[in-house]
Amino acid sequence: LMLALMAIVSWFAVLVDVRGAFLLGDWESDREIYMEVPKGWAKYYEPDSVLKLLKTVYGARQSAKRFWILLLKVMDEMHFARSKADPCLYFKWDAKFGLLVIISWIDDLAILGTRAGVEATKDELFKHFDCDDTGEMKEYIGNKVERRHGALKLTQPVLLQSFTDEFDLKRDLKVRNPAIPGSVLHPTENQLTSEDMFTYRSGTGKLLHLMKWSRPEIGNSVRELSRFMSGAGLPHMKAMYRVMNYCLNTSERGKVFKPTRTCRHEDIHKFEFIVDGYSDSDYAKDPIKRRSVSGFCSFLDGCVLNTKSRMQPITSLSVTEAELVAV
């Protein structure tokens, strides 16, 4: 949603990284946490001594949450409100700079708004945390972010490279689609070895991540692969490699946010955004349970927000019923 707004409103965005974030949190007042004495310091303490932690440390389960609670306090001091829809999204309506948004991903903070507003917010944030300023957002959470011709484009070249580095993938330059049209994967009795199953699960997981962030068109193929995470065979492994080959052969593609309309930043409070949604369904694609597959996508002024492909939880008795379930 924020990337779509960046494209529609032409927001400026920077990325900052909080140094030593998990060392900054405070423990609850009624909680005492202890740790073993590090080996290099054991000679300075009595046997069986332990150290009481005054601050959170890396490795403690509570560290991430305690930093998030600290971040909440800082956001409140900076007059940012937390979104009710997302606990890691903060926003502020400023009289001078208009709408400003901060997105937190653990210790990575993205600041969005006008250039002047973003710079002012960044300077104020640096008063609370010791941060690394990585400049204008070019990459975020493993995604390469490109701006061109009024649009934003997300790609994941590093993840694509891992397909050839981590898997025994035989490149096939002829593959131009993620799956053979109309094909369906079936259960098999000749299942993969435990080692190959680990490879299959790892590869399918990477494809799921790729599908979510930058390649929504492989959603239906990845859904098919995900059905056999506990009992895949050689046909399923070949299908997974086919999707990988398709992604490598079309590495220039990605998720593009190209709005059909644009809005000036100062008019965002009165701009009427248009949300479109589309759904579709096949009929009885699963030959065993006769289940149908639903697909849908939603757009904000032409910028894709969400896509999904899933098997329906019930058995539809007609094409019409399958279409209604998809809606």
Summary of predicted features, one role per range:
Residues 1-327:
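Long, low-complexity, charge-biased intrinsically disordered regions
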